[in-house]
Amino acid sequence: MSETYDFLFKFLVIGNAGTGKSCLLHQFIEKRFKDDSNHTIGVEFGSKIISVVNKFVKLQIWDTAGQERFRSVTRSYYRGAAGALLVYDITSRETYNALTNWLTDARMLASQNIVIILCGNKKDLDADREVTFLEASRFAQENELMFLETSALTGENVEEAFVQCARKILNKIESGELDPERMGSGIQYGDAALRQLRSPRRAQAESIQECGC
């Protein structure tokens, strides 16, 4: 059975190893916690269709390895990404301090208008927190990022992170800031959207033929 959707967006999940990136992806796709998760080697992939602002959007999500030895491999997957979850662990100052490097890579290597949401993961471990909500919120504001704290364990704000990112991309499409037909935008029209685009064009062509212009 073929899938019907209006748009396809390429997403990345980036950040240091051990921040729970694979668990976030698994919680989003499967609606359950992946308790046997190991560090990603290279890149993992998942996809899901979501409803956003009366549109069906298929997200193709690339979960990249956080270890430095895989960076040269994973950077090749940045090209043409429309959105990204930039993930740190609220219980690890080290993962937070690395955010600037990940952000630089994303903005240099992905599409020029990539939409990024900062995710402070492991919100369920608040008692072990090393990074405050306020300082992460300030970092997000200074770098023009959206921001949520998430828990891959409980599912809190996991779907919301992907939906918020997709919604902002849709808003940019509607405003003309993003063009799905531009090479490397990380966005493609789905069958449903293409049918809507072709219908007015077909009607216009038929009108021209009828008037003999």
UniProtKB/Swiss-Prot annotation:
Motif interval(s): Switch 2: 65-74
Placement of sequence motif Switch 1: 39-44
GO molecular function terms listed in the Swiss-Prot or TrEMBL record: G protein activity; GTP binding; GTPase activity
InterPro entries cross-referenced by the UniProt entry: P-loop_NTPase (IPR027417), Rab4 (IPR041819), Rab_GTPases_membrane_traffic (IPR050209), Small_GTP-bd (IPR005225), Small_GTPase (IPR001806)
Lineage top rank: taxon: Eukaryota
Membrane topology of this protein: Peripheral membrane protein
Pfam family, one: Ras
UniProt modified residues of type Cysteine methyl ester: 213
Keywords: Cytoplasm, Endosome, GTP-binding, Hydrolase, Lipoprotein, Magnesium, Membrane, Metal-binding, Methylation, Nucleotide-binding, Prenylation, Protein transport, Transport
Gene Ontology cellular component terms for the protein in this record: early endosome membrane; insulin-responsive compartment; recycling endosome; recycling endosome membrane
E.C. no: 3.6.5.2
Locations listed in the record: Membrane; Cytoplasm; Early endosome membrane; Recycling endosome membrane
Stored SUPFAM superfamilies: P-loop containing nucleoside triphosphate hydrolases (SSF52540)
Cofactor requirements of the protein: Mg(2+)
PROSITE patterns: RAB
Entry binding sites for Mg(2+): 22, 40, 63
GO biological process: protein transport; Rab protein signal transduction; regulation of endocytosis; vasculature development; vesicle-mediated transport
Lipidation positions, renumbered (S-geranylgeranyl cysteine): 211, 213
Function: The small GTPases Rab are key regulators of intracellular membrane trafficking, from the formation of transport vesicles to their fusion with membranes. Rabs cycle between an inactive GDP-bound form and an active GTP-bound form that is able to recruit to membranes different sets of downstream effectors directly responsible for vesicle formation, movement, tethering and fusion. RAB4A is involved in protein transport. Also plays a role in vesicular traffic. Mediates VEGFR2 endosomal trafficking to enhance VEGFR2 signaling.
Family membership: Belongs to the small GTPase superfamily. Rab family.
Protein name: Ras-related protein Rab-4A
Species in which this protein is naturally found: Danio rerio
Recorded name of the encoding gene: rab4a
